[in-house]
Amino acid sequence: MHDKERMQELWQKMSLWMNSYMKSFYSPEKATKAKSHLEIKSAKTIFFDDAQIVDGIILKEKHTWKVTHNCEQLAKHLRLSEHDVMLAKMIGLFHDVGRFYQFTVYRTFNDALSENHAKLGLKVIADLPFMQELSKEDLATLKFAIGNHNARVIEATDNKRYLSFAKLIRDADKIDIYRVLKPYLAPTDGTGCSPDFVDLFIEGKQCDYTKMRTQDDRKLVRLMWVYDINYAWSLKAIVEQNYIEDIIGKLSHDDKMMIGINRLRKYIEEKLATTDVWEG
């Protein structure tokens, strides 16, 4: 079997499993057919009649397919081989697999109040037989990318392939998170942003998400993300939906904040003018 056919066949197995797995958290019929190792058959961990659980699961189900699509489109933009485009889709497919068990058990997507969903996801897929159909290098790449997709910074590595796929999934994920969060974007409640967050924003740095103290801190974190976007293609997708300016419009604009906002706008203009290069 040619590599293209092998990867497509493997993709079919993975996508069918993932589709069934996601639906098993809110579909009784699907749950009865679930594998025992998924640990979702117990009445203590499954809530078909709980609107909060069902809404949260469906939200992440849609997010999963959106991110998978983003991975595919970004991979094609970067002119990856057909093999690597398929690998990028697989990473997108499983990047948030830990979210479903997390939300059902803990009723939160907040890792600080539950478990690191990336690490939880790696546990969920660890024993899936079809994972062994990937080459050792591809499997290691997939695990590294998923394990680092939500990290503040990517784990140090000399492996350019690991690093490049981690960058790809982080971009694909962020593009859709902006979409997910947009309906919840509200005007400033007057509490403002924490001074240390504003300082980091002005410097173009990332922050420790666990230290967010106000609603405006959360908005500022989304603006700081721009400096962590790896490809101009990704940033263009975000800017075209007006996500950045929408967030800016919901913050107070004192002199210090405007320094950060003006720097951000200049950075965006410069980043969009760059050419994307795949280094993996």
Map each language-model feature to its residues.
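Divalent metal-dependent phosphate-bond-processing catalytic cores, especially two-metal-ion Mg2+/Mn2+ enzymes
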Residues: 2-6, 56-65, 69, 73-81, ...
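A broadly conserved amphipathic alpha-helix scaffold signal in soluble, globular proteins
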Residues: 72, 119-129, 144-147, 166-170, ...
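Acidic/histidine metal-binding catalytic segments
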Residues: 79-90, 130-147, 162-168
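Hydrophobic/aromatic-rich structural module bridging two neighboring secondary-structure elements via a short loop
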Residues: 100-141, 152
